[in-house]
């Protein structure tokens, strides 16, 4: 069958059309159309570049009008550079911190001394102040090999989402084992800033993160709690790539868990995202909803500890004041598990979990 009409390309084309026509992304077909150079299609000088620095520079200037050209260059250098001794997970966690909390740049104080300040890379408060571009068939050159990706989604020039698509009749696990794993080996720098990986054959879809094994890629099949489950690709795209949802996921629903001496990147599952956001809305209206805030119920093994972390972190980040969060358990083992999760996911500010465990009423009052 001719390339222009192959089934996987039709899935790819329909993906780009949904992103562009329904969700408001700009769509670019780069396969044999990309013009390299600063004034080219995407502003890439070479196929090795994975950050669209032209678009990143414009975003930094738009979000931080105070930045000088020197500071813009410094910020871009921090966003794109890494040490060869770093693992992919270490790089990814570092870049995620810049995306979420701002990239450090040097600023001169009136007294002549310098200080480090954070420049925003994303505008989480105003969705329309960000630029969303979905690029199909983008050639990326690694140290040895070159690969052509199906769809890469950029926000402010940063490649946040990698989408691998297969034919309807193929098992989507092949997208993981045959394609994604190969890209990790051949063009690993594409995943330095990656927030999430989507794998689909159109009829079935899963999403995961850098470092996730196949069994930890999950379906995203509901847009609201009342929806019937639908595992097809359009549901996942609408649930994750809607601009407001993507920025919310990026800001509030990604964790790096340092338990057990290793680091695991956690993206909220569909039910956690919906449930936590419902709980956040209840907290927002807590005064008028006193006595009927509701219960966020979990089955065993569905991630209740992470849901607590997501909820606590979003409330602390999005609301004024310093809310006190009390976690009650009915077993010492569960008490330790949840407190360790809070510590290992960075919610305790570097302090040890045991400092926050209350053993009596007096402890709790303190």
Please report, for each region that a protein language model flagged, where it lies by residue:
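Inter-Walker segment of RecA-like/P-loop motor cores
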Residues: 343-366
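ATP-dependent helicase/translocase motor core
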Residues: 2-324, 333-349
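Conserved H-loop
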Residues: 330
């Amino acid at each position: 069958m001719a390339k222009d009409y192959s089934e996987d390309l039709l899935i790819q084309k329909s993906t780009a059309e949904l992103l562009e026509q329904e969700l408001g992304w700009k769509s670019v077909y780069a396969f044999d159309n990309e013009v390299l150079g600063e004034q080219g299609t995407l502003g890439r000088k070479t196929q090795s570049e994975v950050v669209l620095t032209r678009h990143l520079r414009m975003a930094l200037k738009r979000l931080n009008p105070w930045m000088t050209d020197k500071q813009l260059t410094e910020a871009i250098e921090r966003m794109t550079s890494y040490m060869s001794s770093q693992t992919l997970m270490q790089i990814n966690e570092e870049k995620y911190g810049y995306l979420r909390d701002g990239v450090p740049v040097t600023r001169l104080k009136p007294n002549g001394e310098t200080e480090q300040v954070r420049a925003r890379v994303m505008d989480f408060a105003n969705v329309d102040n960000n630029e969303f571009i979905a690029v199909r068939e983008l050639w990326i050159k690694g140290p040895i090999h070159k690969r052509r990706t199906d769809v890469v989604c950029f926000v402010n020039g940063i490649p946040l989402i990698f989408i691998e698509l297969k034919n309807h009749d193929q098992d989507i696990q092949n997208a993981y084992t045959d394609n994604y794993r190969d890209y990790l080996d051949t063009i690993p720098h594409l995943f330095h800033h990656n927030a999430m990986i989507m794998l689909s054959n159109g009829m079935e879809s899963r999403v995961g993160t850098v470092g996730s094994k196949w069994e930890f890629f999950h379906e995203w099949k509901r847009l609201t709690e009342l929806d019937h489950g639908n595992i097809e690709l359009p549901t996942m795209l609408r649930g994750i790539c809607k601009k407001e949802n993507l920025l919310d996921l990026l800001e509030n629903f990604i964790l790096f868990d340092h338990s057990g001496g290793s680091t695991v990147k956690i993206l909220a599952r569909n039910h956690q995202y919906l449930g936590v956001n419902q709980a956040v809305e209840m907290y927002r209206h807590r005064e008028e909803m006193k006595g009927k805030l509701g219960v966020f119920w979990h089955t065993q093994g569905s991630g209740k500890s992470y849901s607590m972390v997501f909820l606590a972190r979003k409330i602390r980040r999005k609301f004024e004041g310093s809310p006190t969060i009390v976690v009650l358990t009915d077993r010492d083992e569960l008490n330790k598990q949840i407190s360790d999760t809070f510590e290992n996911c960075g919610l305790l500010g570097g302090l040890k979990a045991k400092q926050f465990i209350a053993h009596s009423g007096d402890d709790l009052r303190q």
